C-alpha cells in the first residue's frame, strides 16, 4: 500500500466569517453579582446557575485573571509515561521543546483550567497545526460555559489517531488558543509534536 503524506487542510470559512454570516452576537458580559441577582423567580435559571456555581459562596481573587489555563496533557494509554505541558511558566520555552508521539497512537488532549471570578460563556480550544511552514490542519473544540470555583476544570477532546507512515513522520508545529464567545484570548501558546516510529528512537 502506498503511503500518502498529510494533505494541507483547506478552510473555506474561519470562525469569524461564520459568526458574521450567522449574524451571531454574544450576549453582553455581566458580573457574577449581576447574574446572581437576575431572574430570582425563574426556577429553571436558578437550577442552571446552581449547576455552574455550586451551593457555596464564591470567593475570588480580584487580581487573578478570570480564566487561567494551567496544563495541557496528552492522554495516551500506550505512552511510556505521562505527557504533560505546564502552561503557567515560560511559554516561550515551550517553542523549543518537542513532545514525542508514536505513529498511529490513539490519544486525547486534556486541557486543565480554572475560572476565578465570573461565569464565562462559549469557551473553546482552537489548534492550528503546521508542517514545514504550511498549515495542514485546524481543529476547534467547543469547551462550554463554566462558573468560578476553587477546583480546576478539565476538558477532554475526542479520541484522535496520530498520523502514521514514513511520509507522515516528522515534527509538527502547533499554535493553540483558549478563547470564548467574546473572542477574549485567555491563553495562546506554541508547541511542537514529533511523530516517530517508536516512542524512543
Swiss-Prot record:
The keyword Transmembrane helix does not apply. Detected in bone marrow, thymus and spleen. Keywords: Acetylation, Cytoplasm, GTPase activation, Phosphoprotein. GO terms for molecular function: GTPase activator activity; GTPase activity; Rho GDP-dissociation inhibitor activity; small GTPase binding. Residues 1-38 are annotated as: Disordered. GO terms for cellular component: cytoplasm; cytoplasmic vesicle; cytoskeleton; cytosol; extracellular exosome; membrane. The modification Phosphoserine is found at residue 145. Gene3D superfamilies: Coagulation Factor XIII, subunit A, domain 1 (2.70.50.30). It comes from the Eukaryota. Regulates the GDP/GTP exchange reaction of the Rho proteins by inhibiting the dissociation of GDP from them, and the subsequent binding of GTP to them. Regulates reorganization of the actin cytoskeleton mediated by Rho family members. This is Rho GDP-dissociation inhibitor 2. It comes from Homo sapiens (Human). The gene is ARHGDIB.
